[in-house]
């Protein structure tokens, strides 16, 4: 039985008539082609972008950690602060699963959040048949469906296989979409969001609020919503979702383990397709905390860790193909290991938390591979302190 609960402002969870057509069209286009088109568009704007040099780490104490996190929250949300009490505007329970072939699924709930005129956040709560009491946020990037290839080969973006593996191990999954990258609204247009007027704080808030408000609901409404009372929260994201994972884990220390996949590298190493959309390089934001600082914030704390996964043969961004060895002064892996070493040393000085970089040598393109899921993400989750 389906139950609709309007928590805040009313807006029906309507699915326009073109929704199914968009969904079918998205599935017909090979993800590698989508990644290639996306990278070409990014390269075309690269020459006009001047990136901040973020190679210097500015966090040296726990006081710095607190101050940086507070400064980021103030930048993103202004005087309103982090939305720690806001819930989704609408919750629809027991919806048809948007992802096929999930053997260990008990139920799916749908969350919708009205963020601005014409801008609605969407997330799905996949409840495991045999819950282990923990939940993983899985954040998509520049794709509009989680229902990609379910097979044993490394095909597609890897969202379906990630959900299936997490459910198999008993983890609840919160699947979250980027702004304007969801069923019913696959228009993109992230750069245009930074031209919006009357935004309190920064448009970056629209990338983070669907996760924040959905987690608020999951942390407080288990009895009323008839779902497991989760005791630990983790996060995985691909591409733009990997960027979201990096930033969200830096801001919200309740994320214990985080796994940004093909999502970011420091700005000083970026060229071409690795530059990304505006949220990836907005100077006023990264002047507060560059990427190495964000990695520290996302990993620092008792029992916290961040494992960043890059794909060597990435067809979009942050792989060897997108690396400028001449500009960096060193080969791809050496350059990546350089910032990993800096972040690890800084965390060692702070005394709590761990950071590690994995370069996926098996994935043939822009994706979460079976290797990343089975040999990196799941073992790290299962070994996390409890």
Residue positions per predicted region:
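Hydrolase active-site cap/lid region
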Residues: 238, 244-284
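C-terminal catalytic histidine-bearing segment of alpha/beta-hydrolase fold enzymes
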Residues: 331, 337-386
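The feature captures the conserved acid-bearing segment of alpha/beta-hydrolase catalytic domains
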Residues: 266-349
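Short, low-complexity intrinsically disordered segments enriched in A/P/G/S/L with frequent Arg
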Residues: 10-16, 24-31
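Short beta-strand element of the alpha/beta-hydrolase
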Residues: 133-142
């Amino acid at each position: 039985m389906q139950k609709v609960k309007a928590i805040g402002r009313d807006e029906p969870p309507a699915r326009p008539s073109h929704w199914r057509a968009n969904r079918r069209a998205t599935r017909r286009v090979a993800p590698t082609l989508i990644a290639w088109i996306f990278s070409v568009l990014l390269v075309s704007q690269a020459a006009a972008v001047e990136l901040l040099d973020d190679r210097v780490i500015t966090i040296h104490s726990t006081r710095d950690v607190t101050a940086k996190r507070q400064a980021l929250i103030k930048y993103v949300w202004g005087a309103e602060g982090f939305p720690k009490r806001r819930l989704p505007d609408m919750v629809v329970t027991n919806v048809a699963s948007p992802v096929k072939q999930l053997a260990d699924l008990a139920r799916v709930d749908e969350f919708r959040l009205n963020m601005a005129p014409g801008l609605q956040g969407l997330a799905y709560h996949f409840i495991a048949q045999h819950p282990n009491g923990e939940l993983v946020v899985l954040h998509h990037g520049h794709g509009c469906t989680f229902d990609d290839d379910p097979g044993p080969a490394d095909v597609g973006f890897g969202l379906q296989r990630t959900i299936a593996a997490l459910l198999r191990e008993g983890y609840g999954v919160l699947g979250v979409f980027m702004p304007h990258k969801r069923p019913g609204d696959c228009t993109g247009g992230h750069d245009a969001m930074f031209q919006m007027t009357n935004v309190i704080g920064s448009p970056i808030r629209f990338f983070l609020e669907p996760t924040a408000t959905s987690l608020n609901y999951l942390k407080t409404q288990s009895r009323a919503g008839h779902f497991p009372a989760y005791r630990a929260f983790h996060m995985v994201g691909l591409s733009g979702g990997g960027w979201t994972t990096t930033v969200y884990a830096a801001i919200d220390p309740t994320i214990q383990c985080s796994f940004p996949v093909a999502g970011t590298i420091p700005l000083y190493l970026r060229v071409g397709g690795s530059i990304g959309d505006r949220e990836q390089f907005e100077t006023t934001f990264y002047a507060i905390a560059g990427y190495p600082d964000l990695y520290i914030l996302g990993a620092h704390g008792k029992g916290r860790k961040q494992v960043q996964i890059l794909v060597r043969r990435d067809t979009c961004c942050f792989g060897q193909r997108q690396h400028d060895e001449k500009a960096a002064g060193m080969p791809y892996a050496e350059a990546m290991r350089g910032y990993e070493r800096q972040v690890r040393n800084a965390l060692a000085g702070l005394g709590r938390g761990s950071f590690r970089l994995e370069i996926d040598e098996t994935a043939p393109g822009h994706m979460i591979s079976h290797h990343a899921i089975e040999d990196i993400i799941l073992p790290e989750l299962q070994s996390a302190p409890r």
